[in-house]
């Protein structure tokens, strides 16, 4: 995982996002739907309808970055609100990206082999 400074605020975009969107499309979503500045240095996490793919949009002061993570098994735990954004800590984000319920951390299934 890319080291994220502790000053960065992490936002989960609640609801579902069209995962065909790229960097510019997600930045537009942040600006129009979440009413926030995508270039302000905050980190935004989006999830698709199936729940196993998350995309992270972050402007680090130099440029805009887009990261993606797909879980081999299970789904990302997502807030139940259908509109807006929910703020979480960097530690909670790390749990989420490992497939662990960030609201109540417990380990989950891990693959034993690649094939």
Each predicted region: which residue ranges?
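Polybasic/polar functional segments that serve as interface/processing modules
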Residues: 1-115
């Amino acid at each position: 995982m890319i080291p994220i400074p502790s000053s960065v605020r992490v936002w989960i975009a609640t609801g579902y996002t069209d995962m065909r969107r790229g960097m510019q499309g997600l930045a537009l979503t942040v600006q129009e739907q979440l009413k926030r500045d995508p270039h302000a240095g905050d980190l935004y996490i989006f999830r698709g309808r199936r729940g196993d793919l998350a995309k992270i949009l972050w402007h680090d002061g130099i440029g805009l970055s887009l990261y993606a993570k797909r879980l081999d098994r299970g789904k990302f735990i997502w807030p139940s609100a259908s509109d807006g954004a929910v703020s979480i800590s960097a530690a909670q984000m790390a749990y989420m990206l490992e497939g662990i319920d960030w609201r109540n951390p417990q380990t989950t299934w891990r693959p034993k082999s690649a094939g």
